[in-house]
Amino acid sequence: MKTALAALIVGYGLDLLLGDPSFLYHPIRVIGNLIALLEKWLRKVFPKTPNGELAGGVFLVILVCLAGYGVPALLLFAAFKIHPVIGFLLEVLWCWQIPATKCLKDESMKVYQKLKENDLPGARYAVSMIVGRDTENLSETGVTKAAVETIAENTSDGVIAPLLFLALGGPALGFLYKSINTMDSMVGYKNEKYLYFGRCAAKLDDVVNYIPARISAWLMILASACERMNWKNAEKIYKRDRYCHASPNSAQTEAVMAGALEVQLAGDAVYFGKVVKKPTIGDDIRPVEAEDIKRANHLMYLTSFLGLVFFAGIRAFFLFL
């Protein structure tokens, strides 16, 4: 499948150049709408008991995964049947839309810009668009840390993991991954509403991100060495703090980022009005500053490029073997 490899490379390039233009309807919105619709229906069908909500959550995962993989696979098959060029163009389009490299940079740089303008309310609003925590009372340091943390975490589940699944199975597998990831972001909360209903989605997200998160961490360590950051500290903090999170995956790249930047990340945060106790990640060698958002993005970009080279190289090796 030489076209799949070419589509991955071209799509990655388009993502870096164009990001997510507003004139293009993003397929992930369709997935999000489907999840919301199915949740509403399943909550009516299954009893409002812990076991009933668990069962409803399992059915949500099954239905969304079937649609997330099956619909793109059928559309791609039909496109190639009509004409190989149409199939290739659709594959390129989806390989462009599935990763979120430039989008992550653009959204986090909005936070940076507001901080440089000394507009703390604006920075709080900008960071609220990319994090799940409450941001209304965050200090400048809190806003900066939140932005750096989301760049670090999304380097794995927004960039490297999508590239990995695209390389393994093309857009259909990429959309399957994004479906699981989107379910987790919508229903994978440990609050009263989603504790049982969202459990299956959250656990599945942990499973599918287990390997990508660790690949992302080591790629980021390599990228920090290429960027002449403190890669030895990045490796040290990674080995020490990579499990300092409720999720087995979220602290993997956060630990590398904290070590490379020589700052302390994570710690307590407020979600839905309640303080959630979290361990810190990294050592407080120096205070976090707005410029760390730019540094984090440089590291994220280089990590994404190394990921593309690594995954495309492996695919090419087996393709031409």
What are these regions, as identified by a protein language model?
Residues M1-L176, I180, G188-L321:
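Hydrophobic alpha-helical transmembrane segments
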